[in-house]
Structure formats: C-alpha cells, structure tokens
From Swiss-Prot:
InterPro entries: aa-tRNA-synth_II, aa-tRNA-synth_II/BPL/LPL, Anticodon-bd_dom_sf, HisRS-like_core, HisRS/HisZ, HisZ
Keyword entries, A-Z: Amino-acid biosynthesis, Cytoplasm, Histidine biosynthesis
Miscellaneous remark of the record: This function is generally fulfilled by the C-terminal part of HisG, which is missing in some bacteria such as this one.
Native source organism of the sequence: Acetivibrio thermocellus (strain ATCC 27405 / DSM 1237 / JCM 9322 / NBRC 103400 / NCIMB 10682 / NRRL B-4536 / VPI 7372) (Clostridium thermocellum)
Keyword Amino-acid biosynthesis (UniProt): yes
Protein task: Required for the first step of histidine biosynthesis. May allow the feedback regulation of ATP phosphoribosyltransferase activity by histidine.
SUPFAM superfamilies: Class II aaRS ABD-related, Class II aaRS and biotin synthetases
Pfam family, one: tRNA-synt_His
Protein name, UniProt field: ATP phosphoribosyltransferase regulatory subunit
GO terms classed as biological process: histidyl-tRNA aminoacylation; L-histidine biosynthetic process
Amino acid sequence: MAEWKIYTPEGVQDILQNECFFKKNLEDRIRKVFRASGYYEVETPIVEFYDVFSTEENIIPQETMFKFFDQQGRILVLRPDLTIPIARVAATKLKDAAYPLRISYIGNAFKYNELGGGKQKEFTQAGVEIIGVNTPEADAEVIATAIDAVKATGLENFQIDIGQVEFFKGLMEETGLSEEETEKMRVLIDRKDFLGIEELVEEHNIRDDLKELILDFPKLFGSTDVIDRVEKYPINERSIKALNNLRSIINILDDYGLSKYVSVDLGMVQSLNYYSGTIFRGFTYGVGFPILSGGRYDRLVEKFGKSSPATGFSMGINMVMMALDRQKVEFEKPRVDTLVCYREEGRKTAFQICETLRKQGLAVEVDINGGDFETARNYAALKGIGGILKVLDDENIEIHNLEKGEVSKVTISELLKA
C-alpha cells in the first residue's frame, strides 16, 4: 500500500534535529557519569536469539517481543531489554575477566506496549551493571550512580524508592501461603489494593501480629523510620536479614551524601522471580511512570552458564526527556555560530578560515547557495545563525552581526588573531 511509505509504524518515530541533539547531549552526559565511576561501555546486538529472553520465570512475556525467523528457521527477536544480554556477555565472553565487572550500556530496545512514554515500541535505555559481588556496597554504588546520572540530565526534583524483596518473601514463608497465593498477594500489594489484601488474609489462619503487618504492607513507605517500625514485629530471620541489608545500603548512601534523594518502600514487590534482594525505582514529577528501575538479580547470570551475583539499573532516556520537557528544564539547542560566504576568488581563503574557526570549537557552515549574499542572509536569519563572514578577497572580510544589525570590515589576520 503505497500511501504508507510516508509514515512510520505506530510506536516508533523520527527524531528530528533539535530533539536528536537534545537526546545525544543527554546520553553523553550520562555516559560521562558512568565512565567517571569506572564503568566500561559494551554494545550487544539489537537482534538476539529468542532463547536469550525466554525463561521459566517469564521475566519478559513472549507476547511483548518482536519475533521473526532467520534463514535456518530459528526464532530471533529485537532485544526487548539490555540487562539480559549483558548477563549473557558476562557469563560467556567475560567469564575469565577480573571481577567485579563494571559494565555500562546505552542502546535501543524494542517491546510491544512498553509501559509509559506513550506506549513506544522503540525506546532507549542507559544503565550499569556490577557483576561478581554481593555486598551492600555494590548495591549502594549502583543507586549512587543512578542518582548521579539523573542529576547530570538536569532533573533536580526526583526520588529513589528502595525496597527489599526478601523481606516480603520472608513474611510469606510465615503465612504458609502457597506459591499461587503468594503471587496473588504480591500483585495486590503492588497495586496497593487494601480491600483485596484484607480478603486474602481473612481466608487463612494467620497469626494476628503478622496479619496486622501484612495489612499495613502498602503503607510501609517513607523515611528509614519504616524499618524501625517493622522491626518491632516478631518476623523471621529471612525478613530480619533483608531489613539489615536495606539499612546498610541506606547508611552507605548517607555517607555518599545522597540521603535527600532516597526513601524506603517495603511495598515494592514487583518481579519476585527476577529480583533477589534490593529493588529500587526512580520517580520525578510530570511523568506517571518510573524514569529508572533496578536492583539485585543474583540468579540471572547463572542462566547463561556461570553462577555470579549481580546488581544494576536501567534508565529510560525517553522518559527522562519527557520529564525534562514537562518540567520546562532549559537545554542547549543546536546552533551554527557562523556562516561563511565567498566569491570565487576568495574560495580557498574561505575554506582556510572555516578550518581555523572549527579548530577553535566553533560550528561553521559554508554557503553553498551559489554566492548570492541576500539568499545566504535570509537563510542565516531563518536558521538563527548569529553572524556571517563574507570573504571579499584573499585579505579582506566583512563581518555581518545579524543579531545587532552591524557590519564591519577586518583583514583575515585581524580576524584570526581575535
């Protein structure tokens, strides 16, 4: 159908000059944060085997993936996530590297009905992974790096909510709920469905103090006082260990000087089959979805043949861009500093001037409209170029300051000295 050739499919889009400049600038800022903290960037293929993302835990539902076949009939996918391919690389090509591994990435992923961002099917993720260490220091470093990355984007009003999935799992052990009922409880708590939680609790013979704690679960968020409050209950060793781990991480973040960005949310219980300890999400106003998420996933790398603990986070670049736009955060826009025009006899000189100015860090365009100055002037005004250098001959130049409406003449040597 020929009429579709001028459109893009639903969920993908062209990114035009200003927005693309903005996006690449954002990625560069984030990349500098990662590199400054010792993370080395890797790239994994956009196309992967379906088996890489197919797990018994159904971490990424198969119906959300873009699937197709290769020439041998094997199922391929456009990667729906970047963390899982990093785990594959760590367990195979980097299995003999010095541990802990600090890996970073920035790349596009593809998924049907991606949460947030207008249901985009193509989106950009940036993140880091620490592989090979299971310590509170590693988890705290990942969270600190996430905070530094958000700050580098220009966002100032944001919050990182931190939870611990082992705390929930420990409580569920005490209740005697089946796996199916535990999953049902997880969903109810994640949705903060108080009525549903109460109904499920009343269906079982759960001791009163534990029942009280479970009913309070969706409200267990805020400052570190939440941990103090929960520790007063007679909880089991697994839950106590989880709370101690969480407190250690928060204390380390306090030493980083990042406490003001951090809050506790013990009701954060999504993806129990994926996360194995710390879990966190980042929020800012103007966007109804997390701008980043992460946590500890000690069982993922093992899927690819090497048992190794891991922790990391992923930031949604598109979500951050949306937040910056809605919060009216000013960002640098692409611009050309100077347009150089010339007559034929001054062409070589004009090119030499361009080269010199570019080495000085200026963005310089050469007029290619055929030498008509008025055409060049109108083009520069329309594009927002501040000035025009008109090369008259091998020695003399006219400087047209379009912002002030001023014209002056200088020699080439005078210009280059300035």
